[in-house]
Amino acid sequence: MVYRCYIKILIDIFVAVLSLIALMPVFGVIAVAIKWDSEGPVLFKQKRCGQYGRTFLIYKFRTMYKTAPYDRPVKELKNPEQYITRTGRVLRRTSLDELPQIFNMIKGEMSLIGPRPFLLAEGEVLAAREKAGITAVRPGITGLAQINGRNRISNDEKVVFDRKYVENICFLTDAAIFFKTIHYVIKRQDIYEGMLEEECQKLGQAPKTFRKWQEDNQ
């Protein structure tokens, strides 16, 4: 409890400030590349569901054209590649588009490690997360679900992983997730754009339905 309520917050602030200072040159290079590649702002802002169900604006480097659907998850788009810019492809494959969430950490809206925040439009999975107690903690830049399948698993499976994380928050868990995330990013593992259920089945990774998740967790 001490780690979750105090030490984890202090670590987040320290890491966020240090990262912001160290990565300023990287931010500058990415900003120039985005502006050179396509019209639109450097940062993409989107409403997400945060701790205790509070709405907040998440920050990302913009990776899509202005014509892209704003409030639809990428996995629901049949051909997401048509909306992603050339610079955006690089940023998404390397997860560099997530770097601006350092500002969310400084504002106290996000943690380095925690359940990824969902869109407000994803009401069904948000209800499941609230029921599972996941919204009791701050959302994270990376989490247990991200090192156990990321885009390859369904939202319902992510709920299971996120609940497991919330029930077992500790420094060792966070450290393990952090280093495994770095490993996954370097390998570019489990990053699929617009993955459909039938495509998951071809990979032998068919996602569970929400009803099945409810039956397993009643």
Please place each PLM-identified region on the residue numbering.
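Hydrophobic alpha-helix-in-membranes signature
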Residues: 24, 99, 114-116
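Short, well-ordered beta-strand elements within core beta-sheets of diverse protein domains
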Residues: 87-94, 163-167
